[in-house]
Design a protein with these regions (language model features):
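C-terminal alpha-helical interaction appendages
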Residues: 1-67
């Protein structure tokens, strides 16, 4: 991917925050559980690799692969 490290980290943080917000606001998970669910997932590990391109995907699409 032709994305700077700074842009990649920003996009990763944004999509992660949005996934957590969806889990808490729409699915009713407590914040701590939502954070744990996202950060401890295999998906989050893959999201941390810019080569996967997952940071370009929508939070809802990513969540569909989390559950």
């Amino acid at each position: 991917m032709n994305v700077s490290e700074k842009d990649f980290l920003y996009m990763k943080e944004q999509v992660t925050a949005k996934m957590i917000a969806i889990l808490t606001e729409e699915q009713g998970l407590p914040l701590e559980l939502a954070i744990d669910k996202v950060y401890s997932s295999e998906l989050f590990q893959k999201l941390g690799n810019a080569e996967t391109g997952l940071f370009f995907q929508s939070p809802r699409y990513l969540l569909s692969h989390l559950q």
